[in-house]
Amino acid sequence: MKWLGDSKNMVVNGRRNGSKLSNDHQQNQSKLQHAGKDALKTGRNAVERRPNRCHGNSGFEGQSRYVPSSGMSAKELCENDDLATSLVLDPYLGFQTHKMNTSAFPSRSSRHISKADSFSHNNPMRFRPIKGRQEELKEVIERFKKDEHLEKAFKCLTSGEWARHYFLNKNKMQEKLFKEHVFIYLRMFATDSGFEILPCNRYSSEQNGAKIVATKEWKRNDKIELLVGCIAELSEIEENMLLRHGENDFSVMYSTRKNCAQLWLGPAAFINHDCRPNCKFVSTGRDTACVKALRDIEPGEEISCYYGDGFFGENNEFCECYTCERRGTGAFKSRVGLPAPAPVINSKYGLRETDKRLNRLKKLGDSSKSSDSQSVSSNTDADTTQEKDNATSNRKSSVGVKKNSKSRALTRQSMPRVPAASNSTSPKLVHMNNSRVPKKLRKPAKPLLSKIKLRNHCKRLDQKSTSRKLEMGNLVLKEPKVVLYKNLPIKKEREAEGPVHAAVGSGCLTRHAAREHRQNPGRGAHSQGDSLPCTYTTRRSLRTRTGLKETTDIKLAPSPLDGYKNGILEPYPDSGQQPTPEVLEELAPETALREEASQECPKSDSCPSRKKFRQGKPVKHLAKTEDCSPEHSFPGKDGLPDLPGPHPDQGEPSGTVRVPVSYTDSAPSPVGCSIVTPDSFTTKDSFRTAQSKKKRRVTRYDAQLILENSSGIPKLTLRRRHDSSSKTNDHESDSVNSSKISIKLSKDHESDSNLYVAKLSNGVSSGPGSSSTKLKIQLKRDEESRGPCAEGLHENGVCCSDPLSLLESQMEVDDYSQYEEDSTDDSSSSEGEEEEEDCEDDFDDDFIPLPPAKRLRLIVGKDSIDIDISSRRREDQSLRLNA
């Protein structure tokens, strides 16, 4: 590729063409004036340059530079460089590289040189390639690569007959300058040079080109000291004499600092241009320069520099570099057959083209063959392995990450605070590991969870239960988009007593079960004849229990705090769609089971494992919520009558379900999400207390967000941290507190009877996020399949508080087979709670205390991101949650 100078030289020529005649006349006069001096000093061109600088009219010629910057005039530099490349590079590469002296004096500039000058130099402009010694010269280079003996190599290179004739007219200084120039090229082949020269046929402007490729790893700001550029300042006369547009003006650039044109030759002249270079030129003296790494360079990566904005036409519109090919700009913009230029990485956010992102695109191209990745992969042509090496190294690191993530997934239950590493094969999700990634960047995670099912969870539950499987109605939920699942499974301490005691699943116990067993034993709102021992049970096990007495009138209206702690908010079917009596029966048995469990679990029955999980967390809030044990009855249009009771009119249940909302009782963990469903039912004045049960191991979590894939509608579950305010019964009084969040779920009757709208407010103006505080949750219920299941439940005498919690194992959320059983319980139970919250349209001032969590973990498929929210304002938290 041409190195430096087309447009820059054109600029110089354009500046010169305006006064070409006058300049030429004056320059000829000055040349003739000093022809005598030049004849006396035929060996040096410094004297020749002196009058040109003194009398020239161009801006950079009036600077009176009496000493050439490199010790060589531009003419000598051209001559020495041509000979050195013919001796060193041409035999090694196998073709003739670019030469400055391609022909005799051009006719347009011959008039600038006097007879004496041209005669004295024996026509130095003429380059005569050395013939017949290519193999011998190549052997010299190969030997030098082994022994690195400069003097020996130089003697071998200049041992021919041609050298005697060449040095016949050279003085000692000129011979020394030529020798040093050859050494510069020989040092390219030293083992410690860190780079090599390779053929390059990429660019249309040259047929036999070369490129510089790194042979070792270079760090940012490293100087590649052996990649040297030799500088000679050009006068206007020398430009006319030496340069021919389109032929040898590839290494000319204009120095704005010195205000003059410069000829750059040497090994650095073979550095190609790139619009996103990895190196830049830095001066190492008056006559030399080297390159400095702008970023880390991998072995095999081509070393590139930036020639300028207008080197390849206006705005580099004819540039053929790799970056232009990847971006679809420059010469590739109008090329037929190429796809329209597309943003490399989410241009909406203006992400920079970093090496990691480019390598990520490279990996994406290997897997998905997208258009962007194709343009990236096309960068690896036959003569470069730069991008391949980068992609390979990146791939290795990603493999390590995947292995780590797998091991973390296995230990997630015991390590609640270990962030799950990215396990997705899609490289576009890598940015989600950044804690400051905007929410919109997380949307590409949407398709990841589209096919996750809970079937594995259901199978585990079935295996662990000895009772017959209860068929639940199918509740179709759009697969969640983002799910936070708990890290710690809650183990049952004792098997359940009674006819279905074996049904308790020890391995997959949800948090609501823990609540049930840890609640006040005296809470006899729904005290059944059966006294169930305090055990950790799942909703499935609760459903399977029999011998329960009829429960009092039930109304589903848990406080949003319950949903906050329990997991996903569980919207209840529209009041317009009154559930069938069978469905109501299902709900009643489970509710009764929950109440029983909560009532019969003594305070003393503390789970040591829960204590262990809490570790250093304060347990004082447990006591706080203990005193809050009043029943909670919520009137609402969506409430469900007690199963045994008659089927009430649509939307108006005859009874109310007392939903114990132990919000303070369970401590949320920023790492995982435990699910807690309402266990017993208390009055609205005092939420579920059971704080004394704090001794049990409770998973702490901050928030749970589920976005429905088809509509993009999010489900949000807010969970209060263990160390937040333990008394939830004062939520109304704290409604004005900015540290509280209120979630109001109401049915959207206008659009769909199954559509629920949740309004979030934090008691204070949430700022710009206040406009986006609506959540719409749509539940689709399969009434037909629920009927027989409900009957079966009723036969067993099991009362269920909410249909969604009953359907935990058979929801079409069973796409979540990849999630752990705990996480599945999370989604199902939280859905049930959301349903319950939908029922309480009049519960406007239930404020959920914002969690003072240190971190918030979002899990998308097998990818997770930990967000540090300790230093964020409450308003910022509400904005983030509202999104």
Curated annotation (Swiss-Prot):
Broad class of where this protein is predominantly found: nucleus
Residues the record lists as binding S-adenosyl-L-methionine: H98, Y203, S204, S205, E206, A210, R257, N272, H273, E320
Stretches for region Disordered: 1-66, 103-124, 363-435, 515-740, 760-779, 812-848
Domain SET: 193-308
Transmembrane segments: none
Compositional bias segments (type: Low complexity): 367-378, 393-402, 761-772
Chain residue numbers at which the record places covalent cross-link Glycyl lysine isopeptide (Lys-Gly) (interchain with G-Cter in SUMO2): K555
Molecular function per GO: chromatin binding; histone H4K20 methyltransferase activity; histone H4K20 monomethyltransferase activity; histone H4K20me methyltransferase activity; histone methyltransferase activity; metal ion binding; S-adenosyl-L-methionine binding
Sequence ranges of Acidic residues compositional bias: 812-825, 831-847
Keywords: Chromatin regulator, Chromosome, Isopeptide bond, Metal-binding, Methyltransferase, Myogenesis, Nucleus, Repressor, S-adenosyl-L-methionine, Transcription, Transcription regulation, Transferase, Ubl conjugation, Zinc
EC number in record: 2.1.1.362, 2.1.1.361
Comp. bias intervals (Polar residues): 19-32, 421-435, 677-690
Protein family membership: Belongs to the class V-like SAM-binding methyltransferase superfamily. Histone-lysine methyltransferase family. Suvar4-20 subfamily.
Subunit annotation: Homodimer. Interacts with HP1 proteins CBX1, CBX3 and CBX5. Interacts with RB1 family proteins RB1, RBL1 and RBL2. Interacts (via C-terminus) with FRG1.
Known role: Histone methyltransferase that specifically methylates monomethylated 'Lys-20' (H4K20me1) and dimethylated 'Lys-20' (H4K20me2) of histone H4 to produce respectively dimethylated 'Lys-20' (H4K20me2) and trimethylated 'Lys-20' (H4K20me3) and thus regulates transcription and maintenance of genome integrity. In vitro also methylates unmodified 'Lys-20' (H4K20me0) of histone H4 and nucleosomes. H4 'Lys-20' trimethylation represents a specific tag for epigenetic transcriptional repression.
Name assigned to this protein: Histone-lysine N-methyltransferase KMT5B
Naturally occurring in which organism (per UniProt): Rattus norvegicus (Rat)
Taxon lineage: Eukaryota, Metazoa, Chordata, Craniata, Vertebrata
